[in-house]
Amino acid sequence: RQMCIRDSYILECHEKAELKPDKRDPSFPAYLQWFHYCEGMVMPPVNTIVVQTVLLPPDRRDETALSQAKKLLTRALEPVNMELSGRDYLIGNFSAADIMLGHACFMSNRLGCVPEEMSNLKRYVANISSRPAFDLAINMQ
């Protein structure tokens, strides 16, 4: 939720960046769906995976919880993979929905939860990763 709040604040303060379609634009409902899909569907299992593989000491990790989270994450990414068929970004043009979900997809791929069969999602992660601002942000020390 914090990511969503942060990104909503940035969007309101920097309207000229055109990272969100006008509410009258036909792509606005899809934009809202994908903007919030990240926090509602993708990040909960990502958080569980990080807790079970990084944050908890090995003796407190739960392989069942980890396995369930990985399966859930892969399932949550299936609609994203389908939506990206024939397009580079979620609503056509790059938007704040891609900022939200793009990072989550990048991390999901890094965690090994994006199978090769999800070729649209693999391509999307490559597109997001090639953006200079993403490269700068992900490699900050």
Language model features by range: what are they?
Residues 2, 6-67, 71-74, 81, ...:
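GST-like domain detector, emphasizing the conserved glutathione-binding G-site
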Residues 55-60, 86-96:
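Acidic interhelical loop/turn segments
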Residues 3-4, 98-99, 131:
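Short, thiol/selenol-centered motifs that function as redox-active sites or metal-ligating centers
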Residues 41, 45-50, 89-114, 128:
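GST superfamily/GST-like fold recognition
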Residues 30-33, 98-99, 103, 123:
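Amphipathic alpha-helical interaction segments
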Residues 13, 17, 57, 86-87, ...:
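Alpha-helix C-capping/helix-to-loop hinge sites
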Residues 117-135:
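C-terminal end-helix/capping segment
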Residues 82-93, 133-137:
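Surface-exposed helix-capping loop/turn segments at secondary-structure junctions
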